Amino acid sequence: MNETQDKIDLLDMNRLPEHVAIIMDGNGRWARQRALMRSDGHVEGVNSVNRITRFSSDLGIKYLTLYAFSTENWKRPQAEVDALMHLIGWTIRKETPDLVKNNVKIHLLGEIDRLPESVRRDLEDGRAATAHCTGLNLNICLSYSSRWELTNAARKIAERVKAGTLLPSDISEETIASELSTAEIPDPDLLIRTGGEQRISNFLLWQCAYSELFFTPVLWPDFDNDAFLEALIGYQSRERRFGMTSDQVSSNNTEHSSGCDSKSE
């Protein structure tokens, strides 16, 4: 039995995170360690995207959100930005048939209008081609930042107040959440960052309020199924309390388990 299967056997398949978000960091360092161009690291990173997307789908994870290109990434050298834009469009065109085959549905988050027209067209074609899929929801964050998202949500809420359709006293957490680009997506249960840095870099700040955080030194191009399983095993080893005590969580879990047992009898 290989190492991957050994790790799969350690998982409780009934307690997998519904939603996993990943900050894919380390492409540039991976390339530098091999005396390659940064663009080579990004190309290799695409292989990891394909690998983890397929594996997430196979495991039955419902939502996978990938931080592919941040608002801040526009500040990178123009040659690198151009290479990334080309790679994004090429990857979507190439991988869409396999996504359809594997029942994976594409969602796009971020300021998509800022992307080059050809890339937008490729992305929209991919989204349209997978619109009927009912398996894994693949959320691709492009030209995205959480501060942009929250500012945009605040602006929309202010417009509703100005129009008289919303009272300031009626603004709630649900009101804000409904104006985010993730309005129809559950909050991440697990946020993974590869590459060794331990920060969340303006990514899903609102949505990750109660997410479990997993930081790994593994560079994104090297992030394979075994590394992903280690993150999932780490997630399942934690107690998610959401402000409650351990005793309360234990009691709720026992009641839920008893209820499930009763229904199955």
Q: Can you describe what each PLM-predicted range is?
A:
Residues 1-265:
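Flexible, compositionally biased loop and terminal segments
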